[in-house]
Amino acid sequence: CIRDRRIAAPLVERAQVDRPGATYRFTVLDDPAQVNAFAVPGGFLYVYSGLIIAAEDEAELAGVLAHEIGHIVGRHSANQLASQFGIQLLSAIALGEEASEYAVDIAQIAAQLSSARFSRDDERQADRYGLRYVVESGYDSTGLVRFFEKLSALEGGKRTSVETLFSSHPATEERIRDIEVMIERSGVAT
């Protein structure tokens, strides 16, 4: 969508300062029911049409795009992939040459599950990058907060303390508070 590229262009320009030479390729996935976006190694960013529909204004969409750009700048997907490969290699060594394919499959699934999401630190770093890119691009700094508030409403409540303890993702409410603190400290609330 041309509008989405226009919104992303200044964010990508700001990200070049932190990761010169990186390329960013945006693809919209047609699924109005999915309110999600993700980044993968190589600068590929995927945004579901449901997220674009859910974003009420450019600042909300810019906030999400900037956050995903932050994952690429932080090399979070690449680091996750390297970690996953390392776990699979160690599993293969530990299982030995005599291991059945079934055992190898289990090891591979376990490796994928162990790194299925970005870490809490990765998410916070992507939020920091994203907030900076949004502000430097002239978008409302509270756009990402507003979008996370929508996600929180969609989630329909908070996680239990056990879910929070074992989650690699900070809770949406926690992320909202963290971003509000970042905005307050930066003095850029718009």
Predicted features by range, described:
Residues 3-190:
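A Zn2+-metalloprotease active-site environment signal
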